[in-house]
């Protein structure tokens, strides 16, 4: 179900290109529409976070599916920019509720870090499948594919627990006694911890949202962007292939993320990840060629999984009710509405794709600073949680 919910987020590069080539939208309009879709995801997730511990989750999922299918069906008969903008927000809203429930349920499992790692491992294959199949479909075919995926997702509804078992915000730590014996203690986790993680997720996804929305368009700029076009030597066919193959780096990322977290915990690898992500994005600011696009996109997918695994596992370690975990898609969706819209404004101001990539790198560094602040605070108060795996 989580894979279905994240379907639009994964397919944004292909969908963005389809909106330009099949519906005639401008690059600026694409940023607004993509932002509306992913902003709806955020709004839906926020609503779900308020209801996830109170209302039967199965009812919420059914309502979300009805909203999402209806909006996608109406998108098939609507082609004007203003109408598509609102329909994509509505589709994203339903998707946000659906995805938030799925993520909250994963966070409530006995081994949430492993559950999220399995999700992201499967995510790599679904991402590759989408990026391979969607470009071969018409605009209506893309919408039909999303409708079909939500219908299939209903098959898993009976396995969805209606309510959470544990509603506490705490963590179990191993404490050494004076006689070298060990015992476990339940420590209450300050509410600022999950909120800071969500803030870091938001900043991270400002980068991801803008990069993922515009990377294919930046590699094949229109004639009116002559100055940027002069810096681009990558071929569109090559970029399309790289998009598909880069998704498999997520698999490698899952494996490395597990190994590193077992040895160094969650926080320290994440801090390094966000710095590296800033570097591999800003390297495109001076132009795109067949070499640096491969390095950037492969590294981006590899590090994207690192960030998701560590951030999701950090929240899951302290929140078993699903309240904060269900806000993960909200923070991601909010970042993905803000990122493309900032990028669209940068393009509208004539600053070009170089400005977009600099903004992306800055957002990643902001996320790193937020997470660093949280890590340093936890080192003083709950060291075991600061370095938890």
Region spans (language model):
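Extracytoplasmic gate region of multi-pass secondary transporters
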Residues: 12-13, 191-244
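Helix-breaking motifs and short loop linkers at transmembrane-helix boundaries and internal kinks
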Residues: 24, 56, 77-82, 265, ...
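Conserved MFS/SLC helix-loop-helix module at the cytosolic interface between two early adjacent transmembrane helices
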Residues: 43-79
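Helix-to-loop junctions at the C-terminal end of transmembrane segments
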Residues: 44-57, 253-266, 347-348
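Helix-loop-helix hairpin linking two adjacent transmembrane segments in secondary transporters
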Residues: 83, 117-166
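Intracellular juxtamembrane helix-capping segments at the cytosolic ends
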Residues: 96-110, 305-319
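C-terminal transmembrane helical hairpin of 12-TM major facilitator-type secondary transporters
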Residues: 264-311
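A late C-terminal transmembrane helix in Major Facilitator Superfamily
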Residues: 318-353, 360
